[in-house]
Amino acid sequence: MSRRLYASLAVAAALTCSVYAQQPPAPAPQGGRGAAPCVTRPPVFFSEDWRQTPANDEHPVTQQSIGNASLEIKLYGSTAKEIQLTGTANNENNPTHVWTGLCSTPCALAFRHKTNYADLTGLARIRWNTKTSGFHQIRPIVKLADGTWLVGDRTDGSTRDWLVTEFNVADVRWLKLDIERIVTTGNIVERPDLSKVDEIGFVDLMPGSGHGAGGWSDVAQVDVFAASVPRTASTK
């Protein structure tokens, strides 16, 4: 190839680069039909870290064990009255918590907000601090506005130490829960309507073994992040 042709190609390339450099930058995408929707994470719907007595002793959990005045506590299972409150506030090695060791049958505990349902759709999530013994695990449970109870396939529980875990409710698969017997029924519930949830809590599907190592679940602080749906006068 001749030197004259090389020179011509170099000049052409330089002119092309100059033209592109003078062109204005493409405008940034504007919101509109093709724009991705804005995703908003829900606020704290409720937080509960329990309220211990001045004696700092072990005793059955009651409504007086709830520190959040907006919540009601609900106990389910034939021996749920044996769920104990124990631990000490601000003690990371033994925080104030509920303990299922004295439940001789499966037990469940749920929270009911006095003025609002929870909308557990979208990016709603649950966070809790738990510890277990043996093969015990805790699972989320919900009571829908129509009275249906569901239990999730999500399980938590570290036998080594207290562990804070958080999960998106949208990732959970659900079975119906017979709340009287605390047993699962039927097949996976496809696309349950979680837009209006009456109660939120947890269940240990195994009986407790009593004090000492063996089999039980501890649950300390519980946080739910969800939108609020006001209750009507008839549902408060």
Functional labels for PLM-detected ranges:
Residues 8-18:
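Bacterial N-terminal signal peptides
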Residues 2, 18-20:
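Residue-level detector of alpha-helical transmembrane segments in integral membrane proteins
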Residues 1-9:
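Bacterial N-terminal signal peptides that target proteins for export
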